Amino acid sequence: GGLMRHTKAAIRIAYELLENKTIGGNFSSDQKYLMLFALLIHDGLKSGIQQEQYTRFDHPLLASNYVKDNKDKLTLNDEEIKFICECIESHMGEWNVDYNGNEVLPLPKNRFQKFVHMCDFLSSRKFLDIKFENDEIVE
């Protein structure tokens, strides 16, 4: 569906940018993997932990908390968990205020968080016509 395509597009955009030496050369291998992991799961709880009818505005916080709650099942250290969670929490960028004007989500602060936001943002732009066939990106 649409969410899976969006996630695949975000990851592909990130991968292509990170493979570019001018852009990707500014990140270590570990940083690249952690940003890709954050993109893989950034919208995983978009409809809540229990499937809800509408998108949860706080879904980045739900996903981040899910990672923290399940960190013992991962082979990541505390610093890596923090890195991933901060990228997930801030992936919405400037769309961090709820319908009542409350600032719910943090803004991206560092280059890693801004990179994850950029890839998420670009994958949602309709003018970037990423072709899919059977939910797979077509070259």
Please place each PLM-identified region on the residue numbering.
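His-Asp-centered metal-binding catalytic motifs of divalent-metal-dependent phosphohydrolases/nucleases
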Residues: 28-52, 63, 88-92, 120
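Histidine- and acidic-residue-rich, metal-dependent catalytic cores
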Residues: 7, 11-14, 34, 59-98
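Alpha-helical phosphate/pyrophosphate-handling elements in metalloenzyme active cores
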Residues: 1-34
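Histidine/acidic-rich helix-loop-helix segments that form or flank divalent-metal centers
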Residues: 25-26, 75-138
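Active-site metal-coordination segments of metallo-dependent hydrolases
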Residues: 1-9, 49-62
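Amphipathic alpha-helical interaction surfaces
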Residues: 13-20, 43-50, 69, 94
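Single-residue recognition of alpha-helix boundary sites
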Residues: 17, 53-54, 131
